[in-house]
């Protein structure tokens, strides 16, 4: 008897629980037929010029039957040496595509349905973005060495139609920040689930609008005349405008029968919204944050950000901490500065900032990596000369690229936290590490950066299918109690607490109009 047949006849009472009355087979594929449809991404323009510090609106045209994934396309201007008679050292702050979004909202028939923030988009992607998608997403939102690492007048010129002899390899650091187009995926309910795509065909009497508030350029760009502690602000760099801005919407085209049903029948969608009650300023170690929330919420997410991390004015003042670290740190949610600066110079030695013997330059890139005669930035005071740099051009490039997602910053500002509902503890007091390590490990795709704290009422908060909520509409008094680290609020130091909540609501569409079933 063949061994496989012996296994087959070794059938007992316990096997009934596994293979009795079978419902599927692994040996004949089955599938389900779907309705016929087509999909096309169509560009939508804003009313008025989209630029730094402005609010613009895009009315979603009725090009298709449904509106699905929506991307913000923004082209950053070139920031180069021509903006000053002297040297220009400049960089876009981390994740420029997210940072330039102050807030973005979707409204139907004049009613705001949801509002989100660049800060929230960063936090959400820290929790949900898979490692496989990370590299592509970083490029989409501009978190690359070409944009977020400081440019240097001694580096290679930008390759373009007017510089036929320019270095074309992306690993060569440049003397300017190139004009670059970013693609920022919006995270509204209808963008993340095809079953929630917005039925434009059923909204004959209501317009759908996307309102976008763009941050001032001072909160997105860092540009000075020197990086040795004596630099001053490059005024002309902050006069630049966005080269272009628009939306790309994935339109869905339905077949005749489904199109008719979609247009004529009423619809109810269970949607997700974001609640944010604003920044709460704190200056002491023990704090009670009142949560003015409504609706069934599936998770709370909060950060505590020291004001010193985002002091944009201070970052342009010579010899201040943020000036030495090459700009403000808007996505640093820890109690200390990130001491790893966004600069090629940090990995190739301090002397690589200037002179013909830069660690990476246009002419010597990867040709003779050990020919550089620069000296190490760390010198023995008793030695006549310093040691040669041991980091090659290739090594410097690898270190710089690897460091894009590495940080030398502090710890979670939250030492302990506790949630109280109507004066009763929802859970016992927990250490901050429980909220930025254990909770994300249990409920999310990835572990976020330090300082992003989570408490989930749902088993699977990333999924649309409800798996647990807490109805804050039925809670009279909700309080988040936080004890913060000394480094966060020591002396006159202050910080901002931001609490976000993801809740469910119902969007009703009938008679050509749409609106929320439950208001605040």
Swiss-Prot record:
Major localization class: virion
Xref: InterPro entries: Capsid_N, MCP_C, MCP_C_sf, VP_dsDNA_II
Keywords annotated in UniProt: Capsid protein, T=219 icosahedral capsid protein, Virion
Species for this entry: Phaeocystis pouchetii virus
Record localization: Virion
Annotated Pfam families: Capsid_N, Capsid_NCLDV
Gene Ontology annotations for the cellular component aspect, listed alphabetically: T=219 icosahedral capsid
Protein name: Major capsid protein
Family: Belongs to the NCLDV major capsid protein family.
Keyword Kinase: no
GO MF terms held by the record: structural molecule activity
Record bears the keyword Chaperone: no
Function text: Major capsid protein that self assembles to form an icosahedral capsid with a T=219 symmetry.
């Amino acid at each position: 008897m063949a061994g496989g047949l012996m296994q087959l006849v070794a059938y007992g009472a316990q096997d009934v629980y596994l293979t009795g009355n079978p419902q599927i087979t692994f040996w004949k594929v089955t599938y389900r037929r779907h309705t016929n449809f087509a999909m096309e991404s169509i560009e939508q323009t804003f009313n008025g010029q989209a630029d730094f510090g402005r609010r613009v609106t895009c009315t979603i045209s009725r090009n298709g039957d449904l509106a699905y994934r929506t991307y913000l396309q923004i082209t950053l201007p070139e920031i180069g040496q021509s903006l000053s008679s002297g040297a220009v050292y400049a960089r876009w702050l981390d994740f420029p595509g997210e940072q330039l979004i102050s807030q973005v909202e979707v409204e139907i028939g004049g009613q705001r349905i949801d509002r989100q923030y660049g800060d929230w988009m960063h936090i959400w992607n820290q929790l949900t973005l898979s490692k496989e998608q990370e590299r592509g997403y970083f490029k989409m939102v501009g978190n690359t060495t070409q944009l977020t690492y400081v440019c240097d007048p001694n580096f290679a010129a930008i390759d373009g139609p007017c510089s036929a002899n320019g270095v074309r390899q992306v690993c060569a650091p440049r003397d300017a920040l190139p004009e670059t187009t970013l693609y920022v995926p919006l995270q509204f309910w209808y963008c993340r689930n095809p079953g929630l795509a917005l039925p434009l065909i059923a909204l004959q009497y209501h317009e759908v609008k996307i309102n976008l508030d763009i941050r001032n350029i001072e909160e997105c760009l860092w540009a000075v005349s020197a990086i040795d502690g004596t630099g001053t602000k490059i005024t002309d760099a902050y006069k630049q405008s966005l080269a272009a801005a628009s939306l790309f919407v994935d339109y869905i085209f339905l077949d005749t029968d489904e199109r008719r049903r979609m247009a004529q029948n009423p619809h109810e969608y269970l949607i997700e919204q974001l609640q944010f009650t604003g920044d709460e300023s704190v200056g002491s170690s023990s704090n009670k944050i009142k949560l003015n929330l409504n609706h069934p919420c599936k998770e709370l997410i909060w950060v505590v950000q020291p004001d010193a991390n985002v002091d944009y004015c201070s970052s342009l003042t010579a010899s201040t901490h943020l000036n030495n670290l090459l700009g403000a740190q808007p996505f640093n949610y820890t109690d200390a500065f990130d001491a790893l600066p966004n600069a090629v110079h940090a990995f190739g030695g301090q002397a690589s900032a200037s002179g013909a013997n830069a660690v990476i330059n246009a002419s010597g890139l990867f040709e003779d990596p050990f020919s550089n005669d620069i000296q190490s930035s760390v010198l023995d005071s008793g030695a006549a000369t310093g040691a040669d740099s041991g980091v090659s051009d290739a090594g410097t490039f690898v270190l710089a690229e690897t460091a894009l997602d590495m940080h030398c910053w502090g710890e979670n500002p939250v030492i302990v936290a506790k949630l109280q509902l109507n004066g009763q503890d929802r859970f016992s007091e927990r250490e901050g590490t429980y909220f930025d390590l254990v909770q994300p490990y249990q409920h999310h795709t990835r572990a976020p950066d330090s300082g992003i704290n989570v408490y989930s009422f749902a088993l699977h908060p990333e999924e649309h299918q409800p798996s647990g909520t807490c109805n804050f509409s039925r809670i009279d008094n909700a309080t988040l109690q936080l004890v913060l680290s000394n480094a966060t609020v020591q002396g006159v130091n202050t910080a901002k607490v931001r609490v976000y909540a993801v809740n469910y609501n119902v969007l009703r569409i009938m008679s050509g109009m749409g609106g929320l079933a439950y208001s605040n």
